[in-house]
Structures are given as structure tokens and as C-alpha cells.
Amino acid sequence: MSGVIAVYGGGGAKAAAHLGAERALREKGLAPIGYVGCSLGAVVAAALALGWEPAAVEERMVELGRRRIAVVDPLIFLLGIKRQSLLKPGPLRAAFEALFGGARFSDMVRPLTIAVTDLDSGDLVLFGAHGKDAPLVDVLVATCALPLYFPPVVIGGRRYVDGGIRSVLPIESALLFAPDRVVAVDVGPGFDEAPATSGATLPALIEINQSSIGISMAQGTLDRLDLWKLTPGRPPLTYVRPRVEKNATFATDKLRAYAEEGYRATKEALSAART
């Protein structure tokens, strides 16, 4: 497939940076012809693949950001570790249903691949283009089901969780499109993250879990980028790393700022790629 494939990685609210990245790509005449998405990056990619304009997606994300999506499951205080997650999955699903309704992968204007993790096999599983078929909302809830926060999602008898557990920036999946160029926008955990400047302090158990998973995700991304460079015959990869903060998964008050940072970082990366 001739053209640019965009890989929009996971990062919670920071995934709004993908909207700025999309805007920068289109301004340079590099509008993606297909998308690979993971976690909330898959939500952004799905909206764009359906043909929505970046500005419209940003408005919808800001609107959804005002909803109470992170709702603590009250039974956690009664049953403790017998529960599957800290948060109720219903509000997250309701938000995605409000955004996408009954949309399916077959409705996409441009092809979309979403990465999820099979909790039992540990495999990275793809849905959509070059992968399995399932209702779009089910797959989006699954790829956003970060363990501890949200429970696994059962699709076709298999338990799936956040795609970022296996690959928060699934660049290899872009190769299935046989693209001329890949642009990967990384808003996931990294060893370059700045300390959080605002927001409530996380409880110790959650902070330790989040930091531990983040270390694994960050190293996994570095390993994949190194492998890409060392593997002959792969298309050019433009890596975009917006400036992000730690513990900003639910920082929905910063969506517009993240979108602008994605725009800045993508313009900078595209300029550097020409030199």
C-alpha cells in the first residue's frame, strides 16, 4: 500500500497529542492512508479512520473528558482483591458508545488496525484491517482495559486487555500495510517523562503498579525502535515523541494542550527527517 501509515500509541489522555500530529501530517501533504492504534491512541485512530476531522475529534474528546469515566467500583471497598478492577467498566463503554454508536471496522474510510493483548496467551492480537473482526466498541474497550484499572474484555471467548501491555507503540503492525513510510507518535511511558506538575497524588499501591508497568512499556518501545533500525528493508520510520508527564493517564483537563504539543513535536520530527 503506497503512502504513510500512522501508528498512534497508548498513553491515556495524552493520546490527544495524536490529533495535533494528524494536523501536522496533513499540512505537509502526508495524510495517513491507514492507521495502527493502541489503547486510547486506537480511539483517536478510529475516529480519524471513520473520516472525522481532527478538530471535530478534539471537541468530542473534550466533551467526553467532562464525563465521569474513571468511576471507582464501590464493591472494591467490600471485596477488595476479589474484584477484577478498581474502576467500573460501564462508564468507559458508555463513553465509547456515545462516540461511535454501532460503527464497525467495515465502516472505516481508511483501514484501521487495533492492537490488544490476549491475557491468557500473552500474544499481541490485531483487530480490524489485517486482523480479526469484532464490534468496534468491544475492541476499543479491550485495548483500553489497563489491568488494575479496568477488567479484561471477553471477545470470542478470549480475555483481552490493553494492547500496551505487549506493545504500547506497535510499529511492527504497520508493516502489514506495506507502506512507503511509517510515522509513529509515542505518548506512552518513557525514561524521559517529566514529573507530574499537577493532579492528585496517586495512592501508593496504584503509583507503584503504574510505575512498574511504565518501566516495562518504556523499555519495550526502545527495543522495538532499535530492532526497526537494525532490520534491513524496512520503510523509513519517523518517530515523534511529544513532551509528556508521568501519571497523566486521566489528565483530561489537558487534552487541548496535549493536542498542541503533538502538533509541535510532529512538525519538528518531520523537519528533522528532511535534513
Write out the residue ranges for each language-model feature.
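Patatin-like phospholipase
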Residues: 1-38, 46-275
